[in-house]
Amino acid sequence: MNPVEASASSAEKILLAATDLFAANHFNGVSIKEIAKKSGVNSALISYYFGGKKNLYQEVLNEQSNLFLNLIARVSSKDIAPLAKLREYITAISEVQKLHPHRIHLIYRELLTPTFMCDSFIKNRLYKIHKFMSELVTEAIADGSIRNNMQPTHVAFTLESIIVFFFLTHDQ
């Protein structure tokens, strides 16, 4: 294995371990030592790759939200009806969550117990996800696929809540 591959695998191990630990215990409940132990790397590598626990946490949140933002890009590019896009996006979100159902806890914990990341995370990441769903509902109302007496934001929040509730209570 060359040094670049070794670096990438160590950073990835740290990121995966941190994601699991932050999802289970939130930012303040996780130590650098725990992350190092779970990832099987020296704790100094966390600072080397990520510049410390705060930057690592930021990267974990960004990576999780990137999963959803990438789905938005994929679904947006399809030439299908708005309601079909909405269904496809919801199905894709559910598939991602099925692979890692505990990771929704990461976002949920950030919303319930905000850290230094909360404001920028919500404004820059979560809002884009909500806005996309609201826009699809608006388009589906416009083309007659959804009743016109529905509020797009309310429909989007309802759908988001159903998905989140399912995965928060799944395996409980």
Feature names for model-found ranges:
Residues 2, 13, 21-55, 59:
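Helix-turn-helix
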Residues 66-69, 73, 99, 116-142, ...:
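Amphipathic alpha-helical packing segments from all-alpha helical-bundle domains
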Residues 50, 109-114:
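Short helix-capping/turn signature of helix-turn-helix
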Residues 8-16, 28-29, 49-73, 87, ...:
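An amphipathic alpha-helix adjacent to DNA-recognition modules
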Residues 104-109, 119-123, 141-172:
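Hydrophobic/aromatic-rich alpha-helical bundle segments in the mid-to-C-terminal region
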Residues 17-21, 162:
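Short amphipathic alpha-helical elements of helix-turn-helix/winged-helix folds
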Residues 1-9:
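N-terminal intrinsically disordered/low-complexity leader segments
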Residues 73-105, 152-159:
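Hydrophobic alpha-helical connector segments
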